[in-house]
Amino acid sequence: MIVAITGATGTIGSAVSAHLREMGHEVICISRNRDRADVYWNPSEGLIESQGLEGIDAMIHLAGESIGNRRWSKRQKTEIYSSRVKGTELIARTLSELDSPPSVFLSGSATGFYGDCGSNQIDEKSPKGSGFLAEVAADWETATTSAEEAGLKVTHLRTGIVLDPQSGMLQKILPLFKLGLGGKLGKNPRRKPSPNYST
């Protein structure tokens, strides 16, 4: 199987890419870094080398500005939003225009879709919540519409913050906890979905 992936160098994407290769699948890395890219793209400029996607079996779209790298200034919130929504619109439109499109499009989303639910239990049928991340996630999912209309099977992957000591949020806060300087993460009671690579 030939699988194209955006965000292949991120926390989730690098693990998914490695797993797919171990299973014998071919992975096509879609990246803004020409040195790493099998297929180059620049979503902020609406550019993608679409010919490199002809004949793929599946598309996994995980790219987007990290929500935990910087303070959420107005500019950073715009980057978080546009990197997800505009990037997804570009991927979906490109897939819908291919002569030989994939049958499956797995597109990133987030558990932020549900907003702050406190200790309430939620599942994929739960309604959209309120707040910035809920709006981002809802628009992110809507951005796949052109691919759905073209007949691709679209699945939205609503993931939480992945806890990995080698990258992401945990890598940043772990040294503080090891020094005894850690504290509560968020207000209580609160559920935090924390996927790991085995899920």
Question: Where do the PLM segments sit?
Answer:
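N-terminal Rossmann NAD(P)H-binding glycine-rich loop of SDR-like oxidoreductase domains
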Residues: 3-23
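Conserved Rossmann-fold NAD(P)-dependent oxidoreductase catalytic core, especially the SDR/UDP-sugar
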Residues: 89-131
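Glycine-rich NAD(P)-binding loop of the Rossmann-fold in SDR/ketoreductase-type enzymes
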Residues: 79-87, 128-131, 135, 139, ...
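Conserved glycine-rich Rossmann-like NAD(P)H-binding loop of the short-chain dehydrogenase/reductase
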Residues: 25-32
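NAD(P)-dependent short-chain dehydrogenase/reductase
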Residues: 148-150, 155, 160-196
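Active-site Tyr-X1-5-Lys
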Residues: 130-154
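SDR active-site strand-loop-helix element
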Residues: 6, 30, 59-63, 105-111, ...
